[in-house]
UniProtKB/Swiss-Prot annotation:
InterPro entries: Prominin (IPR008795). Glycans are attached at residues 178, 268, 286, 327, 388, 404, 576, 582, 617, 693. GO terms for molecular function: cholesterol binding. Belongs to the prominin family. It is found in: Apical cell membrane; Cell projection, Microvillus membrane; Endoplasmic reticulum; Endoplasmic reticulum-Golgi intermediate compartment. The gene is prom1a. It comes from Danio rerio (Zebrafish). Keywords: Cell membrane, Cell projection, Endoplasmic reticulum, Glycoprotein, Membrane, Transmembrane, Transmembrane helix. The chain crosses the membrane at residues 50-70, 106-126, 153-173, 439-459, 483-503. GO terms for cellular component: apical plasma membrane; cell surface; cilium; endoplasmic reticulum; endoplasmic reticulum-Golgi intermediate compartment; microvillus; microvillus membrane; plasma membrane. Its main location: membrane. It is a multi-pass membrane protein. May play a role in cell differentiation, proliferation and apoptosis. Binds cholesterol in cholesterol-containing plasma membrane microdomains and may play a role in the organization of the apical plasma membrane in epithelial cells. Involved in regulation of MAPK and Akt signaling pathways. Pfam families: Prominin. This is Prominin-1-A.
Length: 826
C-alpha cells in the first residue's frame, strides 16, 4: 500500500514536469514577480533512530576489540556476493577464502570444542586418580621449608583468578540485564516508528491538497496581469516605441520654444532699433550743441596768453570727436519677419504636440481595449486548468489508499502488541537460562571465596597437617568442592559459549559492521544478485523495471536525508500521465490565445498636418534674409567715437592747467554737461545696443540651420509615425511574446515549486530509514551486542576456571586436615 500511495505523488510530479516543458525559455518580461507559495505543512516525526549504550558501552567496546583480534580481515564482499549468487555453491569452490576469513573463529571454536570434550574426561580421570591416592588425593602433606611462602603465593594467585572470574560473571550479568531492559525500550522504538508511519499517512493528503490549492496563487497573479494588460503589455509597447517617438516629439516641442525665442528676439530687434535710431538723433543734436558751445568758449582772450594757447588748441582739435559712431538709420527693420513669425505663432504648435503626446500615451488604453476578448479567453482557460486539476485530484484514490495504509499500520501495531507477551515470556526463559549459567560460575566463586576465607582465617601455622582446625579444613573442602563443580559446569559453559561465539561473532562481522560501514548496501545493490534477470531488485520488484537507477543505498540515503518518497523512489520514471494532465497543451493553449492578439496603433497621430504646415511656415519666415553683418557692424562701433567720460575727464584736467577765470569755469561746466549726456543718453543706448547684439546673434544662430532643423524634425516625426502605423508589428509581437512568457512563467514557478516540494517536503520518507535503523538498533545494539558481551564475560570466567582448578587443588593441601604427616626423630 505504501508504494501505491507514493505513485500518487508521482502523478502530480509528472504533471508539473510536462507543463514545465511547455513553458519554454524566452526572455522574461521585467514585470514578472516571484510567487510566494508558502510552506508545505509538515508533520513531526518522533523517532530518534540513535542508540547510545551508556556505561555498558565500555564492555561492548572490549567485546568488539576481542572480535577484531579474532577476525581482523575486512568484510568479504566478493565472497558474500559469489555465495549469494551461486546459492552458497561458491563456498565449496572457494573454501580456502572462507577458511582464511573464518580462521580466527575456527581456531577459537576448535579450542572451545576441545575444551568441552576434554574437560569432562580430564575431570573423570582426575577423580579416579585421586581415588587411587594420586593427583593430590593422598591425605598426606610433606613438610617443606617454603610452605608458608608457597601457600601465600597460591592464595594470591587464586584470589586474583577468582576476582577475574568475578569480573567476568559481572560482565555477563550486566549484559544479560541490559538485554532485558533494552527489550522493554524496544516497545518505545516500535511505537514511535508506527506513530511516524501514521503521521506520514495522515499528513500526505493535506500536503497534496495544499499543493493543489496553491494553484490559486498562480491564478490570482495571472488574473492580476491580465487585468493590467494595458499597464504591463501596453506600457512595454509604449516604452519600446517611445525610444523613437519621444525624441521626435521632444524635437518638435523644442521648435515651439525656438519659435517663441525667435519672436522675442525679433521684437527686441525691432524695439531696440527704433530706440537706437531715436536716441542717436537726440544724442547727435546734444553733442552738436556741446561742440558749438566749446568752440565759442575757446574764443576767450585767455587762449592767447601762454600756456593757454597750447591747451586751447588741443581742446579745439578734440572737439570733432564728440559725435555718434553708429548710424542705425541705415539698418533695415525686421517688421516683415516679425509679422510672419506672429502669423506662425497664431497656431499653437505646443498644443498640437501635446495632443500627439496624449495620443501616444493612450497606448496602454488602446491595448486594454483591443485585447479584451483575448484576456477573457485566457481567464476562461485559467478556470479550465483549475477545473482539470481539481477533477484530476478527485480521480486519484489518495484518501482511500492512505486510509487502507493506515489500517494496515494499525493492524500491524495490534499484531506486534499481541506478540509482546510472547517476547516477554521468551526473554524471561532466556534470562533464566543466562542467570543459570551465571549461577554456575557464582556457585564456583562462592566455594572459592568461602574456601579462601575459611582457609585464611582458620589456618594455624603452629598446627601440624594432622591437627589443623575445623575451619581451615572446611576451607580446603570448599576449595575442592569448587574444583568439583568446575569440572561439572565448565564444559557445559564452554559449549554454550562456543555456540554463542560462532553465531554472534559472525553476525557482528557479517551483518552489523557492514551495515555501519554501508558495505552491506553494496552487497544488496550488486546487479543481478537477488534475481539473475534484474539489475536492481527494488525497481524490479516494485515497478518491473530492473534497469531503473534505484538502489537500496540510494533509497536509504534519500530517506535518511528526509527527502520525499517521490524522489527517493524515483517515481517520475514510472507513469506517463499526459492523457490526464498534459501541461504542454496548456502552454500551447495560452500561446494560441495570444496569437490572435492584434494591436492596431494607427489611430495614434503624433503630429497633425496643421503642425507640419506650421513648422514649414516657420522655416519660411525670412529670418535668414536679415542682414546680420550690417547689424553687427553698427553694434560693434559703439555709441560715440570717443568715450565721453574720458573726454570729460581730460577736459577737466586741461581746465585745471588754466588760470582761474571764466574760461576755466566754462570748460568745467562743459565737462559736467558731457558727463550728464553720457549718463542720461549714452548708457541707455549702450544697453539697447547690448540687447540688439544678443538678439541679432540669437537670430543668426537660429536662421543658420533652421530649414535643416525643421526638415529633420518633420522627418523624425514621419519616421516615428510610420513606425507606429506600419512597422510596430515587430515591437508588438516581441512584447506580446514577453508578456505571454511572463504569464506562462507563473505556471513554471508553480510547477518548479511542486517539483521541489514533492522531492523535499511532501511525504518525507524519514520513517522508512528510521525503520531500517531501528531494526539495526534492535538487532545489533540491543540484542547482538548484549549477547556477545554475555558470552565474552562468561568465556573469560570459563577460561580462568582452569587455573582456578589447579590453584584450588594445590591450595587445599595447605588447609585440609591430613591423615598422616612427616615425623622427624630428634
Amino acid at each position: 500500500m505504501l508504494w501505491k500511495t507514493a505513485l500518487i505523488f508521482l502523478c502530480w510530479g509528472l504533471t508539473s514536469g510536462e507543463l514545465q516543458n511547455g513553458l519554454s525559455a524566452t526572455p522574461a518580461a521585467p514585470a514578472r514577480r516571484t510567487l510566494d507559495f508558502g510552506f508545505v505543512p509538515s508533520g513531526v516525526y518522533d523517532t530518534v533512530a540513535y542508540y547510545e549504550p551508556g556505561a555498558i558501552g565500555i564492555l561492548f567496546n572490549m567485546m568488539h576489540a576481542f572480535l577484531f583480534v579474532v577476525q581482523p580481515n575486512p568484510f568479504p564482499e566478493d565472497l558474500v556476493i559469489s555465495a549469494a549468487k551461486d546459492k552458497f555453491g561458491a563456498i565449496q569452490s572457494e573454501y580456502q577464502k572462507v577458511i582464511y576469513y573464518e580462521l580466527g573463529f575456527v581456531v577459537c571454536a576448535a579450542l572451545g570444542l576441545l575444551f568441552t570434550v576434554l574437560l569432562p574426561l580430564v575431570g573423570l580421570l582426575f577423580c579416579l586418580c585421586r581415588c587411587c591416592d594420586n593427583c593430590g588425593g593422598e591425605m598426606h602433606q610433606r613438610q617443606r621449608k617454603n610452605a608458608d611462602c608457597l601457600r601465600g603465593l597460591l592464595t594470591t594467585l587464586l584470589l586474583t583468578t577468582t576476582f577475574i572470574i568475578t569480573a567476568g560473571v559481572l560482565c555477563a550479568y550486566a549484559a544479560n540485564q541490559n538485554l532485558s531492559s533494552q527489550l522493554k525500550g524496544m516497545r518505545r522504538l516500535v511505537k514511535s516508528n508506527l506513530k511516524d508511519l501514521h503521521t506520514f499517512a495522515n499528513q500526505t493528503p493535506a500536503q497534496i491538497d495544499y499543493l493543489i490549492s496553491r494553484y490559486g496563487t498562480v491564478k490570482e497573479q495571472v488574473l492580476h496581469d491580465l487585468e493590467n494588460v494595458g499597464v504591463i503589455l501596453g506600457g512595454r509597447i509604449h516604452e519600446e516605441l517611445g525610444k523613437e517617438v519621444k525624441p521626435a516629439l521632444d524635437a518638435t516641442l523644442s521648435m515651439t520654444g525656438t519659435m517663441r525665442d525667435t519672436k522675442d528676439a525679433l521684437e527686441n530687434v525691432s524695439l531696440t532699433l527704433e530706440t537706437l535710431q531715436e536716441g542717436t538723433v537726440k544724442l547727435q543734436a546734444n553733442l552738436s550743441v556741446v561742440r558749438n558751445s566749446l568752440r565759442n568758449a575757446l574764443n576767450d582772450p585767455v587762449c592767447v596768453d601762454a600756456p593757454a594757447p597750447e591747451i586751447c588748441r588741443n581742446i579745439r582739435n578734440s572737439i570733432p570727436k564728440l559725435e555718434i559712431a553708429a548710424n542705425y538709420s541705415s539698418l533695415p527693420d525686421v517688421t516683415d519677419q516679425l509679422n510672419k513669425v506672429n502669423d506662425v505663432l497664431k497656431t499653437d504648435l505646443s498644443q498640437i504636440v501635446a495632443k500627439g503626446i496624449a495620443s501616444f500615451n493612450d497606448t496602454p488604453a488602446m491595448v486594454t481595449a483591443q485585447t479584451r476578448n483575448i484576456v477573457e479567453g485566457v481567464k476562461v482557460l485559467l478556470d479550465d486548468i483549475g477545473n482539470n486539476i481539481t477533477s484530476f485530484s478527485k480521480m486519484l484514490p489518495v484518501h482511500s489508499s492512505l486510509a487502507n495504509f493506515t489500517r494496515m499500520i494499525s493492524h500491524t501495531h495490534s499484531q506486534i502488541e499481541d506478540i509482546y507477551p510472547q517476547i516477554d515470556q521468551m526473554d524471561f526463559y532466556r534470562w533464566i537460562g543466562c542467570i543459570t549459567l551465571c549461577c554456575m560460575i557464582v556457585l564456583i566463586l562462592t566455594f572459592n571465596f568461602l574456601g579462601l576465607l575459611c582457609g585464611i582465617l582458620g589456618f594455624d601455622r603452629h598446627a601440624s597437617p594432622t591437627t589443623r582446625g575445623c575451619v581451615s579444613n572446611t576451607g580446603g573442602n570448599f576449595l575442592m568442592a569448587g574444583v568439583g563443580f568446575s569440572f561439572l559446569f565448565s564444559w557445559v559453559l564452554m559449549g554454550v559459549i562456543t555456540a554463542l561465539f560462532l553465531a554472534g561473532g559472525n553476525l557482528e562481522k557479517l551483518v552489523c559492521e557492514p551495515f555501519q560501514t554501508r558495505q552491506l548496501f553494496k552487497v544488496l545493490d550488486t546487479p543481478y544478485l537477488v534475481n539473475s534477470a534484474w539489475r536492481n531488485f527494488i525497481p524490479g520488484y516494485l515497478y518491473n523495471d530492473p534497469e531503473m537507477d534505484l538502489t537500496a543505498y540510494s533509497l536509504y540515503s534519500n530517506c535518511k536525508d528526509n527527502r520525499g518518497i517521490y524522489s527517493a523512489l524515483h517515481l517520475d520514471r514510472i507513469f506517463n500521465i499526459s492523457s490526464f494532465f498534459n501541461t504542454s497543451v496548456y502552454s500551447k493553449d495560452v500561446s494560441r490565445k495570444f496569437e490572435g492578439l492584434k494591436v492596431d496603433l494607427r489611430g495614434i497621430i503624433l503630429l497633425e498636418s496643421e503642425g507640419k504646415v506650421n513648422l514649414n511656415n516657420f522655416s519660411e519666415t525670412g529670418i535668414n534674409e536679415i542682414d546680420f553683418a550690417a547689424y553687427l557692424e553698427e553694434v560693434n562701433k559703439g555709441v560715440t567715437r570717443i568715450d565721453l567720460i574720458d573726454f570729460a575727464n581730460q577736459l577737466d584736467a586741461q581746465a585745471d592747467q588754466l588760470s582761474k577765470g571764466t574760461l576755466q569755469t566754462s570748460l568745467k561746466g562743459h565737462a559736467n554737461t558731457i558727463r550728464q549726456i553720457h549718463i542720461q543718453q549714452v548708457v541707455p543706448l549702450e544697453q539697447s545696443m547690448s540687447t540688439l547684439n544678443q538678439s541679432i546673434r540669437l537670430l543668426e544662430r537660429t536662421s543658420s540651420d533652421l530649414p535643416l532643423r525643421v526638415e529633420d524634425v518633420l522627418k523624425a516625426v514621419d519616421d516615428a509615425q510610420n513606425l507606429i502605423s506600419y512597422n510596430a508589428t515587430f515591437v508588438i509581437n516581441q512584447e506580446t511574446e514577453k508578456y505571454k512568457q511572463n504569464i506562462i512563467g507563473y505556471f513554471k514557478q508553480y510547477i518548479d515549486w511542486i517539483r521541489t516540494s514533492l522531492a523535499l517536503e511532501v511525504a518525507t520518507c524519514k520513517p522508512l530509514s528510521n525503520i531500517v535503523d531501528t531494526v539495526e538498533i534492535l538487532g545489533c545494539g540491543f540484542l547482538l551486542d548484549s549477547m556477545n558481551t554475555f558470552w565474552f564475560g562468561l568465556g573469560c570466567c570459563t577460561l580462568f576456571l582452569l587455573p582456578s582448578i589447579i590453584l584450588s587443588v594445590k591450595l587445599a593441601k595447605f588447609y585440609r586436615r591430613m591423615d598422616t604427616e612427616d615425623v622427624y626423630d630428634e
